[in-house]
Regions:
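Glycine-rich flexible loops
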Residues: 1-199
């Protein structure tokens, strides 16, 4: 197993053990480094058909991503990564993807793929390529706050900053709050892509 795959599996399992991934809740994606792609290239499947992403991400054209599968349970990733995960490749337009590894029992990448990729494109630009992970978890305490606080960026930011001293360090520019939306579509991808950290 490659080190980046081991790290991905550990992160997914750590989140599951925290109680952040009920059933098939949440998703995770990692943008591979060029040297990682070359290291695993012999293990990749033959190129298949291109599938539309549903959004355009030209800043990610030709890149590879390790992603969780749609409907897959985080608790099972550590047991059977080839069933639960996929490595996908984007085409040269950033409009289509194809599966190059994983999902051996069928399936597709996370239904939140458009959101993940739009956020990866933003983070890549903002951090000069340093930022490589998008993680969507159902953190119980944060979910509870959505029932007692107004859904306002500044109010949420202040409450989170006051709740743990590390929060201002982790997200010094605050968080963005997106109201309830149907997951997995273009609209939620656009809404989350214009924020640095999203609740």
């Amino acid at each position: 197993e490659s080190k980046f795959v081991q790290g991905f599996i550990k992160m997914a399992n750590d989140g599951y053990l925290q109680g952040w991934h009920e059933r098939n809740g949440g998703n995770l994606s990692y943008r591979l480094k060029p040297e990682e792609v070359e290291m695993i290239r012999p293990r990749l499947n033959a190129p298949g058909e291109w599938i539309p992403i549903g959004v355009e991400v030209p800043g990610l054209a030709g890149e590879f991503f390790l992603v969780t599968g749609s409907g897959k349970y985080f608790r099972n990733i550590i047991v059977d990564p080839e069933v639960c995960l996929a490595i996908i490749e984007l085409d040269e337009t950033g409009m289509n993807y194809r599966i190059r590894w994983g999902l051996v029992e069928g399936g597709r990448p996370t239904s939140e793929l458009p959101t993940h990729l739009m956020n990866h494109e933003v983070k890549k630009k903002l951090t000069n390529g340093k930022h490589r992970v998008i993680y969507h978890a159902h953190t119980t305490n944060t979910i509870a706050l959505t029932f007692v606080l107004p859904l306002d960026d500044k109010i949420f930011t202040r409450e989170l900053w006051e709740s743990a001293t590390e929060c201002p360090v982790v997200f010094p520019d605050g968080v963005g709050v997106v109201g309830w939306m149907v997951p997995g579509g273009r609209e939620i991808a656009i809404k989350t892509a214009d924020r640095k950290s999203v609740v």
